[in-house]
Curated annotation (Swiss-Prot):
RuBisCO catalyzes two reactions: the carboxylation of D-ribulose 1,5-bisphosphate, the primary event in carbon dioxide fixation, as well as the oxidative fragmentation of the pentose substrate in the photorespiration process. Both reactions occur simultaneously and in competition at the same active site. This is Ribulose bisphosphate carboxylase large chain. It comes from Sorghum bicolor (Sorghum). SUPFAM superfamilies: RuBisCo, C-terminal domain (SSF51649), RuBisCO, large subunit, small (N-terminal) domain (SSF54966). Belongs to the RuBisCO large chain family. Type I subfamily. The record marks 334 as: Transition state stabilizer. It catalyses: 2 (2R)-3-phosphoglycerate + 2 H(+) = D-ribulose 1,5-bisphosphate + CO2 + H2O; D-ribulose 1,5-bisphosphate + O2 = 2-phosphoglycolate + (2R)-3-phosphoglycerate + 2 H(+). Binds 1 Mg(2+) ion per subunit. It is an enzyme of class 4 (lyase). The modification N6,N6,N6-trimethyllysine is found at residue 14. The modification N-acetylproline is found at residue 3. Gene3D superfamilies: Ribulose bisphosphate carboxylase, large subunit, C-terminal domain, RuBisCO large subunit, N-terminal domain.
């Protein structure tokens, strides 16, 4: 099929094209603790053997090119090349294979997710010999993890800053996401925070548009935060989206947020880019700001089962680049998210050490060597009837975010927020008493309705709303 290179200068230069597998398929290779390991789902073109396809991925994402070049003799390819060291068929699909590739750590710049992805998921994804290619998982070695700052603060520091423990946090995305004036936007934030939510949020595409410039929004939202805090005695926050067209403008917005004294800012990390995200994360740690991350554009990359990159890889990359929250799907809402897969990458976000578990899509054991964790955010098509399931699935270290499920309440924003707070506290109390939320959830919510008119009204309006018509695209 395609190229390859001799690995030792002593062999001498011999021009021509060789099969990749002659050099890059090494089933005898024993992986090192310092290697970055990748699991690719490979769909070769007809007639291309899986060994050649896996070797091609290893070559084109590391040191290889389409033909032998004389400059190979000026370095040690054995030291720097990627190696396809194991291939296994995908059960139920004879045309697909999981190819495992090991990359020497020296191929990557320290502390740069940008450089890591440029190599591993760069040009190789357009390679003609492959019909499709998907990066399913990465093992990041501790030696490389330690070159990253990671989240600005992490789960425990955030709880200490907010003085909130023993329950999930509650949020709300302000709707309509576009079109409100800054003052009306701030009013909606205030009503939600006063009603019992911990956070309100800019939607991902709220930046600085003609109908609402960023500085005006920041000021009115800060006013809403301080007024709600004074009335409730609780610390409140609003995710002020600092995403901008340049890194300089992004940091300017974060600086203004800090000057206002608010606790948290936000970034769209995929559309904004990993370099921008890491820059903002470093600023947030240095200046005491929490950082909420939205994953806008992720489904372009991760939704197709045979091509792209799984979200668990994007989640690991975010933990390295830096963020205190990230949207992770809901399992029960309107957006894509199969339960076991979601729980797999939720653990990768929060826990310090995660064992290999193929039943949840985790291909490698991952040791984060005490890097702070990231709080998963469940958001998208959820309402009070989902509260028992969300509490059971995500546990305490999560943010449950109800946009339409707050602002769509028949009595208004503050009653909508109150309904969510009552439902959450009822579920947490029931769980702490040993009740089974999965089995008794509806009864728990109905019982709470007896002493909360706001919750009763919310339950009535959304009693028929479900999003289980469509099956998840990405399954194990």
């Amino acid at each position: 099929m395609s190229p390859q290179t001799e690995t030792k200068a002593s062999v001498g230069f011999k021009a021509g094209v060789k099969d990749y597998k002659l050099t890059y398929y090494t089933p005898e290779y024993e992986t090192k603790d310092t290697d970055i390991l990748a699991a690719f789902r490979v769909t070769p073109q007809l007639g291309v053997p899986p060994e050649e396809a896996g070797a091609a991925v290893a070559a084109e994402s590391s040191t290889g090119t389409w033909t032998t070049v004389w400059t190979d003799g000026l370095t040690s390819l054995d030291r720097y090349k990627g190696r396809c060291y194991h291939i296994e068929p995908v059960p139920g699909d004879p045309d697909q294979y999981i190819c495992y590739v090991a990359y020497p750590l020296d191929l990557f710049e320290e502390g740069s997710v940008t450089n890591m992805f440029t190599s591993i998921v760069g040009n190789v994804f357009g390679f003609k010999a492959l019909r499709a290619l998907r990066l399913e998982d990465l093992r990041i070695p501790p030696a490389y993890v330690k070159t990253f700052q990671g989240p600005p603060h992490g789960i425990q520091v955030e709880r200490d800053k907010l003085n909130k423990y023993g329950r999930p946090l509650l949020g709300c995305t302000i709707k309509p996401k576009l079109g409100l004036s800054a003052k009306n936007y701030g009013r909606a934030c205030y009503e939600c925070l006063r009603g019992g939510l911990d956070f309100t949020k800019d939607d991902e595409n709220v930046n600085s548009q003609p109908f609402m410039r960023w500085r005006d929004r920041f000021v009115f939202c800060a006013e809403a935060i301080y007024k709600a805090q004074a009335e409730t005695g609780e610390i409140k926050g609003h995710y002020l989206n600092a995403t901008a067209g340049t890194c300089e403008e992004m940091i300017k917005r974060a600086v203004f947020a800090k000057e206002l004294g608010v606790p948290i800012v936000m970034h769209d990390y995929l559309t904004g880019g990993f370099t921008a995200n890491t820059t903002l994360s470093h600023y947030c740690r240095d200046n005491g700001l929490l950082l909420h991350i939205h994953r806008a554009m992720h489904a372009v990359i991760d939704r197709q089962k045979n091509h792209g990159m799984h979200f668990r890889v994007l989640a690991k990359a975010l933990r390295m680049s830096g963020g205190d929250h990230i949207h992770s799907g809901t399992v029960v809402g309107k957006l894509e998210g199969e339960r076991e897969i979601t729980l797999g990458f939720v653990d990768l976000l929060r826990d310090d050490f995660i064992e290999k578990d193929r039943s949840r899509g985790i291909f490698f054991t991952q040791d984060w060597v005490s890097m702070p964790g990231v709080i998963p955010v469940a958001s998208g098509g959820i309402h009070v009837w989902h509260m028992p399931a969300l509490t059971e699935i995500f546990g305490d270290d999560s943010v449950l975010q109800f946009g339409g499920g707050t602002l769509g309440h028949p009595w208004g924003n503050a009653p909508g927020a109150a309904a969510n707070r009552v439902a959450l506290e009822a579920c947490v109390q029931a769980r702490n008493e040993g009740r089974d939320l999965a089995r008794e959830g509806n009864e728990i919510i109905k019982a709470a309705c007896k002493w909360s008119a706001e919750l009763a009204a919310a339950c009535e309006i959304w009693k028929e709303i479900k999003f289980d018509t469509f099956k998840a695209m990405d399954t194990l």
